[in-house]
């Protein structure tokens, strides 16, 4: 069909959301209005009408009946006016061509009026494909019937021509007038055999109708192919072979396209080097297209308008480069396709990219394979030759520092969660040996991750928590099992600490509390080390004084009695009497608590007498 501007528009189906889109002839790249997927238009090559080859000629001659070679030398005579009757097959063929053209135009009009909604449009096109498939079967039966009828007519005409003797020019003119749709001219000297061969060539070179194309598309189980009435059978076979369901998912990681014919094109060495340099320098500008995901409700996008005006965006150029680099004949092999694809993507964390065939039964695990290289490219440094799992395992098992605590090796905390293909122990230890790795180019700056958090594997974390909990339990048990010691309160005695030193062995002794309770002139205390009896006296019940003077006086008295034995007898009872008086227990007055606090009676407590209590 043709639009108002004279451009050919082709209806295609989005390989991702199965939505019917209109594809212009001069727009190579466009965007789906349903899923916002960027698609690449299939390059249209009009197949030239080729002349019949030698193989087709031999094949046509092999299918001829044996009675045909007898009439090869038939010549046209000017004297005889034998008229070749117009074969009924020609008129039937002409009517068939008219009917086919009318049906083709009606089909194209119906396809043009289809709604672009997700549900209704898909159901209507499926119903039309089923109906067109049935009509295509009927047409095939009609074609076979017409071909057999034409063969019989040509054979009969050849037989009648041989019996009559010759064919005139008028026969050829009448036959040519009865077949206006033919593409090959019939010479005046042409025989019925050549005429039949030309008819077969016309049928072979004839462009298939929309019924044939739609029926061929309906036979595809995936339902994601394009609907193109201008495509030749060779291009149909090629498109079926190039369909993503029959290929690996690694060839479709770079960009999402409806055709892969541009993959065969190669970049020059200078262009490839410039592309890689721009990838490393990080000149991607995603802020130019903030509304990338919000451009729905239309079958085309500003990409097509820019192409019409001659404007080529930066991201579009890099998309074409990614397609050329990732082609089956590209300079990069299968190992480097995914790495270059991830580098061509803008260097931004959490880039919003969806899988090419999400929801397709033929690619159930494509999202998993897509997430792993994305986390790998975001978190790990970029290398010229890439880094595989075997290299990481080798570094982990052969590096003595990597098997240790892994000090100084810090990477992002998101890496262990996103990258499910590696376990955290390898990631935690493999980063410590990046500076000494031969894979790292010397001119590349040192890699510093943006998140400063140490990664610890789940096993190590569990062991640490278990050891910490066990240590806490041991400390709690030790505190519980500790023997409870009785609390001993030390009260001050005589205005100070109740501790004295022995006179003979200098051992620290503690004074008992009853020194203040009992009102005596002298208090006796025996040392537990040297068994020496110490005598103390209290002065004003605030100062503790050792009673040594009494011993000196006793010695002097003993010396004086030895000198005068007469005076010795009366002196002894006095000394004994005085010692007995000193050791007499005073009369208890008041409560012991009051005496301990320095009060002898209760009245002193109320009167708050400034006078010290009597002894």
From Swiss-Prot:
Mutant phenotype after disruption: Mild, hypersensitive response-like lesions under long-day conditions at late growth stages. Enhanced salicylic acid (SA) accumulation and SA signaling-dependent disease resistance to Golovinomyces cichoracearum UCSC1 associated with enhanced H(2)O(2) accumulation and callose deposition in the infection site as well as higher expression of defense-related genes (PRs). Reduced endocytosis rates.
- Which is a GO BP term held by this UniProt record? endocytosis
Q: Which residues form a coiled coil?
A: 104-129
Regarding tissue, the record states:
Expressed in stems and rosette leaves, and weakly in inflorescences. Not detected in roots.
The Basic and acidic residues compositionally biased stretches are 134-148, 565-577
Query: Which stretches does UniProt call biased (Polar residues)?
Result: 63-89, 119-129, 296-314, 552-564
Name the residue ranges with Low complexity bias: 159-168
Q: Which GO terms describe its cellular component?
A: endosome; plasma membrane
- The highest taxon in the source lineage is Eukaryota
Instruction: Please name the Pfam families in this protein's record.
Output: EDR4-like_1st, Zn_ribbon_12
Compartment(s): Cell membrane; Endosome
Alphabetical keyword list: Cell membrane, Coiled coil, Endocytosis, Endosome, Membrane, Plant defense
- Annotated region (Disordered) at 46-271, 292-336, 549-592
Question: What does the record note about the induction of this protein?
Answer: Rapid but transient induction by wounding, salicylic acid treatment or pathogen infection. Accumulates at the penetration site of powdery mildew (e.g. G.cichoracearum) infection.
**Mainly localized where?**
membrane
Function (record text): Plays a negative role in salicylic acid (SA)-mediated resistance to powdery mildew (e.g. Golovinomyces cichoracearum). May modulate plant immunity by regulating the relocation of EDR1 by interacting with CHC2 and modulating endocytosis.
Q: State how it assembles.
A: Interacts with RLK902. Binds and recruits EDR1 at the powdery mildew (e.g. G.cichoracearum) penetration site on the plasma membrane. Interacts with CHC2.
Q: What is this protein called?
A: Protein ENHANCED DISEASE RESISTANCE 4
């Amino acid at each position: 069909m043709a639009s108002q501007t004279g451009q050919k528009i082709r209806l295609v189906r989005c390989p991702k959301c199965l939505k019917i889109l209109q594809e212009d002839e001069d727009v190579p790249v466009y965007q789906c209005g349903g899923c916002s997927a960027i698609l690449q238009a299939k390059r249209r090559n009009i197949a030239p009408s080729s002349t019949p080859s030698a193989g087709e000629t031999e094949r046509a001659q092999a299918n001829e009946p044996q009675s045909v070679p007898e009439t090869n030398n038939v010549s046209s005579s000017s004297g005889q006016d034998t008229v070749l009757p117009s074969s009924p097959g020609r008129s039937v063929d002409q009517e068939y061509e008219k009917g086919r053209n009318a049906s083709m135009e009606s089909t194209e009009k119906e396809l043009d009026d289809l709604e672009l909604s997700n549900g209704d449009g898909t159901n209507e096109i499926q119903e039309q494909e089923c109906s067109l498939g049935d009509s295509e079967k009927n047409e095939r039966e009609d074609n076979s019937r017409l071909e057999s009828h034409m063969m019989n007519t040509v054979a009969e005409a050849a037989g009648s021509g041989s019996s009559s003797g010759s064919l005139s020019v008028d026969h050829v003119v009448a036959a040519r007038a009865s077949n206006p749709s033919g593409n090959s001219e019939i010479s005046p000297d042409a025989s019925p055999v050549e005429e039949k061969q030309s008819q077969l060539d016309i049928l072979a070179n004839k462009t298939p109708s929309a019924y044939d194309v739609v029926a061929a598309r309906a036979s595809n189980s995936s339902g994601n192919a394009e609907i193109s009435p201008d495509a030749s059978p060779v291009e149909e076979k090629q498109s079926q072979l190039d369909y993503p369901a029959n290929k690996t998912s690694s060839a479709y990681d770079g960009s999402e396209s409806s055709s892969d014919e541009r993959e065969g094109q190669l970049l020059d060495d200078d262009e490839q080097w410039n592309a890689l340099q721009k990838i490393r320098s990080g000149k991607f500008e995603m802020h130019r297209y903030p509304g990338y995901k919000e451009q729905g409700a239309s079958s085309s996008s500003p990409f097509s308008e820019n192409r019409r005006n001659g404007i080529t965006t930066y991201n579009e150029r890099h998309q074409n480069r990614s397609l050329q680099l990732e082609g089956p004949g590209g300079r990069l092999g299968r190992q480097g396709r995914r790495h270059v694809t991830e580098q061509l993507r803008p260097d931004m964390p959490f880039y919003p990219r969806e899988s090419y065939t999400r929801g397709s039964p033929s690619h159930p695990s494509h999202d998993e394979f897509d997430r792993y290289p994305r986390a790998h490219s975001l978190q790990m440094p970029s290398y010229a030759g890439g880094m595989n799992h075997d290299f990481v395992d080798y570094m982990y098992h052969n590096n003595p520092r990597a098997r240790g605590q892994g000090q100084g090796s810090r990477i992002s905390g998101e890496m262990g969660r996103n990258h499910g293909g590696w376990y955290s122990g390898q990631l935690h230890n493999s980063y410590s040996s990046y500076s000494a790795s031969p894979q790292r180019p010397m001119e590349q700056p040192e890699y510093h991750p943006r998140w400063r958090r140490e990664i610890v594997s789940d096993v190590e974390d569990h062991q640490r928590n278990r050891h910490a909990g066990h240590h806490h339990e041991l400390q709690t048990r030790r505190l519980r099992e500790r023997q409870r010691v009785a609390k001993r309160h030390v009260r001050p005695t005589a205005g100070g600490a109740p501790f004295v030193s022995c006179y003979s062995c200098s051992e620290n002794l503690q004074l008992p509390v009853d020194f203040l309770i009992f009102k005596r002139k002298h208090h006796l205390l025996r040392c537990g080390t040297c068994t020496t009896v110490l005598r103390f006296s209290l002065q004003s019940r605030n100062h503790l004084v050792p009673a040594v003077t009494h011993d000196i006086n006793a010695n002097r008295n003993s010396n004086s009695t030895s000198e005068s034995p007469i005076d010795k007898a009366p002196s002894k009872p006095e000394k004994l009497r005085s010692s007995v008086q000193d050791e007499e227990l005073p009369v208890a007055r008041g409560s012991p608590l009051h005496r301990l606090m320095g009060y002898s009676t209760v009245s002193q407590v109320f009167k708050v007498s400034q006078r010290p209590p009597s002894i």
